[in-house]
């Protein structure tokens, strides 16, 4: 039986990152974690490109443009949607997650979901580098593994 696995080596890979500017205090921590993970696994800073989207809702379109360009081995999507008093949270989080998944399937490029969807600011802070780790770091590690897995399967 042949088994395919993606290695956690980012040398010679190129990554696009789409970050939503809304809740930038949280997203900037996710971004730092993602860049840290890429660099720790061998990626040069010149092989990372960042696009700032106005908010989480706009992330799928920008990630699609990046994925379709063919310039990237993977695209990492980072954002923070925090529940408020209205149903807006439900609509935004649902559409962002669907859009990111559809982009990955449509383009064949790994497009990684690193968008926090939390009930409150405390949960977002916990997931942006405190007691629950940094989900931006985790998303970047997933991007590295998926980029290598796609290359391995294609060989």
UniProtKB/Swiss-Prot annotation:
GO cellular component: cytosol; riboflavin synthase complex
Molecular function per GO: 6,7-dimethyl-8-ribityllumazine synthase activity
Name of this protein: 6,7-dimethyl-8-ribityllumazine synthase
Ribonucleoprotein among keywords: no
Catalysed reaction, written as an equation: (2S)-2-hydroxy-3-oxobutyl phosphate + 5-amino-6-(D-ribitylamino)uracil = 6,7-dimethyl-8-(1-D-ribityl)lumazine + phosphate + 2 H2O + H(+)
Taxonomic path: Bacteria, Bacillati, Bacillota, Clostridia, Eubacteriales
Pathway named in the protein's UniProt entry: Cofactor biosynthesis; riboflavin biosynthesis; riboflavin from 2-hydroxy-3-oxobutyl phosphate and 5-amino-6-(D-ribitylamino)uracil: step 1/2
Keywords: Riboflavin biosynthesis, Transferase
Similarity comment: Belongs to the DMRL synthase family.
Active site: 88
Disulphide linkage map: none
Its biological purpose: Catalyzes the formation of 6,7-dimethyl-8-ribityllumazine by condensation of 5-amino-6-(D-ribitylamino)uracil with 3,4-dihydroxy-2-butanone 4-phosphate. This is the penultimate step in the biosynthesis of riboflavin.
CDD domains linked: Lumazine_synthase-I
Gene Ontology biological-process annotations: riboflavin biosynthetic process
EC number: 2.5.1.78
Residues given in the record as (2S)-2-hydroxy-3-oxobutyl phosphate binding sites: 85-86, 127
Binding positions (5-amino-6-(D-ribitylamino)uracil): 22, 56-58, 80-82, 113
SUPFAM superfamilies xrefs: Lumazine synthase (SSF52121)
């Amino acid at each position: 039986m042949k088994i395919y696995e993606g290695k956690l080596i980012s040398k010679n890979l190129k990554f696009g990152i789409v970050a939503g500017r809304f809740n930038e205090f949280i997203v900037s921590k996710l971004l730092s974690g993602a860049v840290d993970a890429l660099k720790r696994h061998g990626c040069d800073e010149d092989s990372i490109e960042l696009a700032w989207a106005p908010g989480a809702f706009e992330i799928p379109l920008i990630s699609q443009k990046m994925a379709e360009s063919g310039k990237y081995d993977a695209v990492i999507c980072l954002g923070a949607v925090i529940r408020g008093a209205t149903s807006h949270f439900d609509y935004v989080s649902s559409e962002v997650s669907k859009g990111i998944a559809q982009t990955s399937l449509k383009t064949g490029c790994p497009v990684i979901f690193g968008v926090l969807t939390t009930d409150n600011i405390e949960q977002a802070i916990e997931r942006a580098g405190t007691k629950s780790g940094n989900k931006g770091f985790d998303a970047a590690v997933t991007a590295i593994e998926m980029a290598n897995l796609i290359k391995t399967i294609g060989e």
